[in-house]
Amino acid sequence: MAIFDAFRKNRILGKIAVAFPKELKDDLEKVVSALLYSIKEIEGGERKWIMSDGETVAIPYRIDVSHFRYIAYTGLNERQMAILHCIYTRSLDGFVREGHLKELLRMGADKYEWVKPYIISSAGEYVVEILDTLYNNISEDKIPEYRAFCKLNFENIRLLHARMISYWAEFYRLDCYYYKDYIGKRLFSEVFGMRKSGQKVID
């Protein structure tokens, strides 16, 4: 059993290690141990994000991970809990993604730069409640940090912005006819500094 557990752990770590900075190796191993039989599959389509120190992380599009609402992840410190919540923001279940985004923002985990790509990636979701969660829970004093990170990763922001507009046009135009009033527009403009299509830089 121990051999099988070690094999499973190494297989998961081999796929997910690129999603976090190398300095978090020990913390990530502890989180993966806690989720050893919850993580079933890590789907491809990773998007690369640049950290301010030049290191790159690759966030997976989705992670098939079981969610236990009342489970107590005993023994995990704050940073490790932030890693766990980041993993769940890639869940297949939109309600789970939204809940763990709220937890990340509630605990102020976006003080860690490596948390920001998980939060920002969620702005490209089709679930409008997630956009609302981000807009209403990102602290105003953190906005300069988000904009600096978005500026560093402008191509990703441009693509997410285009996706957000596409989802509005496809799914939400009947409920919010004017794009200027759409929560996604306000999120990208007021928080991330991406005010319009064709914008060349975030200032």
Question: How does the language model describe each region?
Answer:
Residues 101-105, 119-120:
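Amphipathic alpha-helical segments within well-ordered protein domains
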Residues 84-86, 116-120:
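Buried hydrophobic core positions in alpha-solenoid tandem helical repeats
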Residues 100-103, 130-135, 198:
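Conserved hydrophobic register position within alpha-solenoid helical repeats
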Residues 110-114, 129, 141-145:
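Alpha-solenoid repeat scaffolds
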Residues 2-99, 142-203:
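Extended repeat-based scaffolds of very large eukaryotic assembly and lipid-transport proteins
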